[in-house]
Amino acid sequence: MRRAWILLTLGLVACVSAESRAELTSDKDMYLDNSSIEEASGVYPIDDDDYASASGSGADEDVESPELTTSRPLPKILLTSAAPKVETTTLNIQNKIPAQTKSPEETDKEKVHLSDSERKMDPAEEDTNVYTEKHSDSLFKRTEVLAAVIAGGVIGFLFAIFLILLLVYRMRKKDEGSYDLGERKPSSAAYQKAPTKEFYA
């Protein structure tokens, strides 16, 4: 039983140390020391253009509307008495997708306002209108995060109670003196007291 507890404890320590080691290595990978960049080998020059432009900035970008071209063969069936022939022609369809001029936040706001006004006008069709809402900015207002935090707290609390009960059990067992440490107590006959009388010649 004692071996099982030792193995369980070693397993838990290994898991915790592996997680902390993974967090430390990921932090080292994410942040670089600027002073060591000049000393490192194989360093490329810093391109300032990449830092000035960001995803979705749209200030210097030329927006091209993509043209989709699809071709489908259309069979022409001419009925003749001798042999049926199938001739195919190609139909070209060009679709132009207009470029979006509004930001996604503005379009989301418009959808929310439109759906609110539609809900006021026609309350019978509430279930058919589906739109997306932005999630709240606070992390603890989300139900799944709150449930995970509560579950983690309960598990941690139960583990702490288990450790305290184990400690109390071990202390009581130690007070009783029932530990078998694998050491044999020498019998009283093994060590006999030498006579304390001294003889002087």
From Swiss-Prot:
Disulfide bond annotation, renumbered to this chain: none
Cleaved signal peptide residues: 1-18
Region (Disordered): 42-70, 90-130, 178-201
Record's compositionally biased regions (Polar residues): 90-102
Protein name from the UniProt record: Syndecan-2
Pfam assignment, any one: Syndecan
Residue numbers of Phosphoserine PTMs: S115, S187
Posttranslational mods: O-glycosylated with core 1 or possibly core 8 glycans. Contains heparan sulfate. Also contains chondroitin sulfate.
Broad class of the protein's primary localization: membrane
Glycosylated position list: S41, S55, S57, T101
